[in-house]
Amino acid sequence: MHINSKDNPRVKLFRKLLSSKKAREEHGLFAVEGARNCVDTAYEAVCGRIKVHSVFYTQTALTKYKNTLKTDSLFSCTRPEDVFEISDELAKKMTDEGNSQGIYMIVFKVDLPFVAEYIDKNGKYLVLDNLQDPGNLGTLLRTADAVGVSGVVMTCLLY
């Protein structure tokens, strides 16, 4: 199917998911953009690890990234009625990025549980939460290794 309007509900949803954490939490969805990211996402969907809500692509992107894109998995990772061709002009309006690659997805969030079986009850762990300066991560990891911690647990905003 073809979408031409920025007022299309799915295009509006994509833009909202891209810019709003609240929207991502409310809808249980997140936005993916770029050829490589979408190929990786399609692979995960074909393997059954995630579920794709919608795919958007331009003909220009299919031509430009033909060596990167595996169009069979890109188009088979969701139902055919959820795959949309869009114009180059609309692609530029879907993202705030200056150089749109013309490939986008809306994907259902996956809740990943904390796996307690990997934690040694007698171990010492460094827990990093809300790390403000990722540049400090290397120093923290080297220090943790030097003092013999069993592992590092890091939190992050996945979506």
Regions found by a protein language model. Give the residues of each.
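Glycine- and other small-residue-rich loops at beta-strand/loop junctions that grip anionic moieties
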Residues: I3, F30, D129-N130, T155-C156
